[in-house]
């Protein structure tokens, strides 16, 4: 007798939840009739996807149309942004075998934001029917220093010099986040039992999260026809008009001995959202809690001068 034959179904399902990986579970379903009936009952899944990418020329028009008062600074054409073009039908079909999903983690093979060598962008976005918030930390290069010093603010000239790069980082992150949100729309609406959704790439560059409230909001909201047309055309969810709090340090020396050049913290919220002055710190620190270098950078950058920007929907 096989060792599994003596185990009750709930224990087998619990073991399958520990396995988690969707491809492995689908292989397990072919082992026997019993496994074929129990695998679809798995509640905690990890779906690893391959995807193709394409260059999006939309960034140039975004620069020219979304930022009031910055056209002269951003007149030089920007390089295309690389975004995910994976079809939403793929995860939908793969997960169609499962009918009790409660917690879903989705992993893409690589990040969406393409940067010059040495630069890094890390972001975390929360969604409901649309973007709720996004926190972005970026820097041009990282090195070590012999002794940490206090963080200083920046001059207006320093802010203007690096503004275009910081805007590129921000738009890249928002486009990547909205592409991932679009990717899972069909899955969220079909699997009403899902209570938690987390999407990240293997490099841990960007993370999209949806909690139970946000998932219900997406399922219960009917998009306007014109918005739906934009979504299908662009293969990503519409980014609403947003307000951004941007903080920047030309050289950020951390207590850990790491020095970040052109370090930037951007906190993005929808224009109509209500929030208190102190909410920036709470949102940013929670986004990178447990992430040593980025968490330390957030704390340091929150002490820098804040610059406010507004961006139209795109």
UniProtKB/Swiss-Prot annotation:
Top-rank taxon, per record: Eukaryota
Occurrences of domain F-box (ranges): 1-49
Pathway(s) per entry: Protein modification; protein ubiquitination
Localization, UniProt: Nucleus
Keywords: Nucleus, Ubl conjugation pathway
Gene Ontology biological-process annotations: cellular response to hypoxia; protein ubiquitination
Main location as per UniProt: nucleus
Inducers of expression: Not induced by auxin.
Record InterPro entries: AUF1-like (IPR044809), F-box-like_dom_sf (IPR036047), F-box_dom (IPR001810)
Cellular-component GO terms for this entry: nucleus; plasmodesma
UniProt xrefs under Pfam families: F-box
Quaternary structure (record): Part of a SCF (ASK-cullin-F-box) protein ligase complex.
Function as written in the Swiss-Prot or TrEMBL entry: Component of SCF(ASK-cullin-F-box) E3 ubiquitin ligase complexes, which may mediate the ubiquitination and subsequent proteasomal degradation of target proteins.
Entry note about domains: The F-box is necessary for the interaction with ASK proteins.
Protein name: F-box protein AUF2
Species in which this protein is naturally found: Arabidopsis thaliana
């Amino acid at each position: 007798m096989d060792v599994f034959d003596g185990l009750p179904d709930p224990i087998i399902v619990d073991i399958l939840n520990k396995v988690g990986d969707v491809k492995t579970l689908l292989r397990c379903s072919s082992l026997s009739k019993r496994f074929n009936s129990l695998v679809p009952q798995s509640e905690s899944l990890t779906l690893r996807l391959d995807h193709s990418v394409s260059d999006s020329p939309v960034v140039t028009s975004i620069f020219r149309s979304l930022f009031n008062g910055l056209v002269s600074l951003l007149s030089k054409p920007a390089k295309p942004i690389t975004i995910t073009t994976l079809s939403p039908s793929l995860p939908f079909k793969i997960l169609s075998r499962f009918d009790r999903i409660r917690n879903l983690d989705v992993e893409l093979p690589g990040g969406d934001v393409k940067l010059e060598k040495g630069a890094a962008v890390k972001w975390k976005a929360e969604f409901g029917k649309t973007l709720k918030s996004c926190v972005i930390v970026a820097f041009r290069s990282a090195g070590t220093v012999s002794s940490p010093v206090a963080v200083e603010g920046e001059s207006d000239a320093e802010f203007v010099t690096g503004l275009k790069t910081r805007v590129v980082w921000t738009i890249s992150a928002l486009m990547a986040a909205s592409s991932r949100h679009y990717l899972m729309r069909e899955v969220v609406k079909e699997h009403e039992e899902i209570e938690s959704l987390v999407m990240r790439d293997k490099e841990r560059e960007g993370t999209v999260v949806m909690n139970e409230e946000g998932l219900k909001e997406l399922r219960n909201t009917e998009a306007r026809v014109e918005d739906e047309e934009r979504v299908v055309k662009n293969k990503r969810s519409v980014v609403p008009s947003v307000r951004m709090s941007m903080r920047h340090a030309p050289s950020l020396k951390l207590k850990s001995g790491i020095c970040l050049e052109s370090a930037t913290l951007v906190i993005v919220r929808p224009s109509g959202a209500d929030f208190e002055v102190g909410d920036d710190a709470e949102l940013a620190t929670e986004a990178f809690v447990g992430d040593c270098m980025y968490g330390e950078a957030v704390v340091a950058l929150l002490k820098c001068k804040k610059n406010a920007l507004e961006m139209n929907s795109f």
